[in-house]
From Swiss-Prot:
NCBIfam families (alphabetical): rplA_bact (TIGR01169)
Protein source organism: Psychrobacter arcticus (strain DSM 17307 / VKM B-2377 / 273-4)
Keyword set, alphabetical order: Repressor, Ribonucleoprotein, Ribosomal protein, RNA-binding, rRNA-binding, Translation regulation, tRNA-binding
InterPro entries on file: Ribosom_uL1_bac-type (IPR005878), Ribosomal_uL1 (IPR002143), Ribosomal_uL1-like (IPR023674), Ribosomal_uL1/biogenesis (IPR028364), Ribosomal_uL1_3-a/b-sand (IPR016095), Ribosomal_uL1_CS (IPR023673)
Classification lineage: Bacteria, Pseudomonadati, Pseudomonadota, Gammaproteobacteria, Moraxellales
Matching Pfam families: Ribosomal_L1
Domain of life the protein comes from: Bacteria
Name used for this protein in its record: Large ribosomal subunit protein uL1
Function: Binds directly to 23S rRNA. The L1 stalk is quite mobile in the ribosome, and is involved in E site tRNA release.
HAMAP family with a match to the protein in the record: Ribosomal_uL1_B
Amino acid sequence: MSKLTKRQKEINSRIEHEKQYTIEEAVQILNDLPPLKFKESIDIAVNLGVDPRKSDQVVRGATNLPAGTGKTKRVAVFAQGAAAEAAKEAGADIVGFEDLAESIKAGNMDFDVVIAAPDAMRVVGQLGTILGPRGLMPNPKVGTVTPNVAEAVLNAKAGQAQYRVDKAGIIHTTIGQVGFTAEQVIQNAEALISDLRRAKPATSKGTFIKKITLSSTMGPGLSIDPVPYRTAK
């Protein structure tokens, strides 16, 4: 068995593994941990009362986070004509059409989000085996296939959390950075969970928001009391 590092020992001394924390308490703990050489994300995992094996219970979407994510994302847009110009004005980092597709095929992947106008999907569709495994394939369910590419660019730049339930019925996404205030994380978490409640499949029965966990990139997973988040505020 590998030895615990000094940081791991300190983490273990600060947390109660059986406790359910408030988000405010959890953020305080994560912010007070010994800092690393990089800025850690604050991530959330929400266990949902769904069976993702059933196609009508696959929960997928995107939430515009009120406090952002703390990171600036590079955005690539597939568009032409007026839509391409609008994307550039909105702050897109890369805008193109067939030329962008060829660049991606050549291995140029210097972006975090891909947005496409509907008429560009005939081009983007050729990139499924490249973009799909990386979670970058545009999809109308998360607002990345849209006639209003400028708005999508603004949302991505402002801080948007995309999510899709995994095989275990859990969504994982980033809702901030270490250093965010508790209020910022609470605002983002409430916005996300509110969207999740609205996305509850009609065939999902029983408790929908089953469990919530907050963590930092290299920090502990802290169990959050889910009860206050099961109903609209």
